[in-house]
From Swiss-Prot:
Catalysed conversion reaction: 5-phospho-beta-D-ribosylamine + glycine + ATP = N(1)-(5-phospho-beta-D-ribosyl)glycinamide + ADP + phosphate + H(+)
Co-factor binding comment: Binds 2 magnesium or manganese ions per subunit.
Gene symbol of the encoding locus: purD
Taxonomic source organism: Phenylobacterium zucineum (strain HLK1)
InterPro entries, A to Z: ATP-grasp, ATP_grasp_subdomain_1, PreATP-grasp_dom_sf, PRibGlycinamid_synth_ATP-grasp, PRibGlycinamide_synth, PRibGlycinamide_synth_C-dom, PRibGlycinamide_synth_C_sf, PRibGlycinamide_synth_CS
Pfam families found in the cross-reference section: GARS_A, GARS_C, GARS_N
Annotated ATP binding sites: 133-193
Protein name: Phosphoribosylamine--glycine ligase
């Protein structure tokens, strides 16, 4: 098979690492990819939202499958155009992609199809959002409506902080994504990430993990795209998994199909496990980043047949995936200043050495100079991942590897996995 993988982050590097290991794959091309992905695939300098160029590239390499990594490609309508050209694609249409690209759409969708979620108000102005605060008790949750790279959510402890978040959104901090906001009820419980595949009709659960959104240890500081993950996560008891499947996953797939946009790809369900059962926090229409990294380390099965089955409508013929009876941890190394303005261009050394058993480093935001020097080129720069017999072993391996990487402008959290280890 010839496969085109779209994207350039740590999630896409993890997908490339797993896809390249498949005996079914003859040629793997990434667009645009990153320096780390060059070990697994050919790189082409085509951006993830340049739909005409991506379709042309898929035709050029005679792609048997296009795998869409980032949400920006979904929002740009890449899957729609590929389907129109008869090119098999793993990833939903832009219509189905509204489950991520608009918080207001998702809230209305949840109401329409009975998915449990937090009480909310959609606000078109700062004045309306400030008035909506009267409906809720602190902490307040303020969400930019559109795509904001995981940084558009503020959990405000008091009204002053909430009003500042509202002013930031309507003041242009998130561009068009902040043209309206959702003010919602704060949910008490433990958050988790669950993934499900769908081929337009049949669906299948595809792993779960737990993320760390806040930038600093102890869940302090602003939200990020994710500072680390681990899998399996003890919060996902068999009872909770079944509740998520029946109350969130299956109604979501049925609902989006009823709306005229059958879902093909992976759905990322971010949920809060409350005393009243799971409640939807948000949907994402792609693998989580960095959740994907730990799932790929734990996935024993060949990933490619599942991607193909989603694209071709044969998921119902596939067996459940097989997972390693091991834990996996991902620790994100970010550039200082993230999630604000990250330090750019810092030199990175030490990735060419043996970093230990079952350790894999995925590139997330890197570039390589003409002389081969590796440098930071983003907020989240590296994903240091490790497997182990248990969570503590995997975590220790990841942090031991980080100690051997030289990146003066980088930082990471030191407490990834604290919820599970503290049980």
């Amino acid at each position: 098979m010839n496969i085109l993988l779209v994207g350039s982050g740590g999630r896409e590097h993890a997908l490339a690492w797993k896809i390249a290991a498949s005996p079914l794959v003859k040629r793997l091309v990434a667009a645009p990819g990153n320096p780390g992905m060059a070990e697994q695939c050919e790189l082409r300098a085509v951006g993830p939202t340049d739909v005409p160029a991506l379709v042309a590239l898929a035709k050029e390499i005679a792609a048997d499958l296009v795998v869409i990594g980032p949400e920006s490609s979904v929002d740009a309508g890449l899957a729609d155009q590929l389907q129109a050209e008869g090119i098999p694609c793993f990833g939903p249409t832009a219509g189905a992609g509204q489950l991520e690209s608009s918080k207001a759409f998702t809230k209305a969708f949840a109401d329409r199809y009975g998915l449990p979620t937090a009480a909310y108000r959609v606000c078109e102005s700062a004045e309306a959002a400030r008035a909506a605060l009267e409906l809720f008790e602190p902490p307040y949750v303020i969400k930019a409506d559109g795509l904001a790279a995981g940084k558009g959510v503020t959990v405000a402890q008091d009204r002053g902080e909430a009003e500042a978040a509202i002013d930031d959104a309507f003041g242009g901090r998130f561009g068009a994504a902040g043209a309206r906001v959702v003010v919602e009820e704060f949910l008490e419980g433990e958050i988790g990430s669950l993934f499900a595949l769908c081929d337009g009709e049949a669906s299948m659960l595809f792993g779960w993990a737990q993320d760390h959104k806040r930038v600093f240890d102890g869940e302090q500081g602003p939200n990020t795209g994710g500072m680390g993950t681990y899998s399996p996560a003890p919060v996902f008891t068999p009872e909770l998994v079944e509740q998520v499947r029946t109350r969130l996953v299956e109604p979501a797939f049925a609902g989006i199909a009823a709306d005229g946009s059958p879902y093909r790809g992976v759905l990322f369900v971010e949920l809060m496990a409350t005393k009243h059962g799971p409640k939807l926090v948000e949907f994402n229409v792609r693998f989580g980043d960095p959740e994907c990294q730990v799932l790929m380390l734990r996935l024993e099965s060949d990933l490619v047949p599942y991607l193909v089955a989603c694209a071709n409508g044969t998921l119902g013929d596939m067996p459940p995936p097989v997972w390693r009876d091991e834990a996996a941890v991902c620790v994100v190394i970010a550039a200082k200043g993230y999630p604000g303005t990250p330090a750019a261009g810092g030199e990175i050394r030490g990735l060419d050495q043996d970093l230990g058993d079952d350790v894999v480093v995925f590139h997330a935001g890197t570039k390589r100079d003409a002389d081969g020097t590796l440098r930071a080129a983003g907020g989240r720069v590296l994903n240091v991942c490790a497997r182990g017999a248990d969570l503590r072993t995997a975590r220790d391996r990841a942090y031991a590897a980080i100690e051997r990487i030289e990146f003066a402008d980088g930082f990471c959290r030191s407490d990834i996995g604290w919820r599970a280890l503290g049980r």
